[in-house]
C-alpha cells in the first residue's frame, strides 16, 4: 500500500493538469502560429509561468486499489499483484489464466 500522502499528491497533480489543460493548448497553438523565433520565445516564457505540476508529463499511473505506482496495467488500472489476485478469484470478467 502506498503512502496516503503520495496518493493525495497525485490527485492534486491530476486536478492541476485538468485545470491548466486549456491554457496549455492555447499556448501550444500560438507557438505553432508564431512566425519568428522571438515570438516563440515570448510565448514559451508564458508557459513557464504555469505551475510545474500542471504539466501532464508529471502524472503517474497508480493502482486504483493500492496506490502502487510501478507495474500498472493500463487496461485495468491495477498493479500486477492486485491483477493476479483478482484474476485468480474470477473478479475480472473475461480474464483467464493461460496454459499451454
UniProtKB/Swiss-Prot annotation:
<protein>
    <recommendedName>
        <fullName>Small ribosomal subunit protein uS14c</fullName>
    </recommendedName>
</protein>
<keyword id="KW-0694">RNA-binding</keyword>
<dbReference type="InterPro" id="IPR018271">
    <property type="entry name" value="Ribosomal_uS14_CS"/>
</dbReference>
<keyword id="KW-0150">Chloroplast</keyword>
<dbReference type="GO" id="GO:0009507">
    <property type="term" value="C:chloroplast"/>
</dbReference>
<dbReference type="GO" id="GO:0003735">
    <property type="term" value="F:structural constituent of ribosome"/>
</dbReference>
<dbReference type="GO" id="GO:0015935">
    <property type="term" value="C:small ribosomal subunit"/>
</dbReference>
<keyword id="KW-0689">Ribosomal protein</keyword>
<comment type="function">
    <text>Binds 16S rRNA, required for the assembly of 30S particles.</text>
</comment>
<comment type="similarity">
    <text>Belongs to the universal ribosomal protein uS14 family.</text>
</comment>
<dbReference type="GO" id="GO:0019843">
    <property type="term" value="F:rRNA binding"/>
</dbReference>
<dbReference type="InterPro" id="IPR023036">
    <property type="entry name" value="Ribosomal_uS14_bac/plastid"/>
</dbReference>
<keyword id="KW-0687">Ribonucleoprotein</keyword>
<dbReference type="GO" id="GO:0006412">
    <property type="term" value="P:translation"/>
</dbReference>
<keyword id="KW-0934">Plastid</keyword>
<comment type="subunit">
    <text>Part of the 30S ribosomal subunit.</text>
</comment>
<dbReference type="InterPro" id="IPR001209">
    <property type="entry name" value="Ribosomal_uS14"/>
</dbReference>
<dbReference type="Pfam" id="PF00253">
    <property type="entry name" value="Ribosomal_S14"/>
</dbReference>
<keyword id="KW-0699">rRNA-binding</keyword>
Amino acid at each position: 500500500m502506498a503512502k496516503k500522502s503520495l496518493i493525495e499528491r497525485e490527485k492534486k497533480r491530476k486536478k492541476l493538469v485538468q485545470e491548466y489543460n486549456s491554457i496549455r493548448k492555447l499556448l501550444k497553438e500560438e507557438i505553432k502560429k508564431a512566425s519568428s523565433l522571438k515570438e516563440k520565445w515570448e510565448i514559451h516564457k508564458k508557459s513557464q509561468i504555469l505551475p510545474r505540476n500542471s504539466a501532464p508529463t508529471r502524472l503517474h499511473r497508480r493502482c486504483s486499489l493500492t496506490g502502487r505506482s510501478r507495474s500498472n496495467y493500463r487496461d485495468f488500472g491495477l498493479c500486477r499483484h492486485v491483477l493476479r489476485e483478482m484474476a485468480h478469484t474470477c473478479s475480472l470478467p473475461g480474464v483467464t489464466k493461460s496454459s499451454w
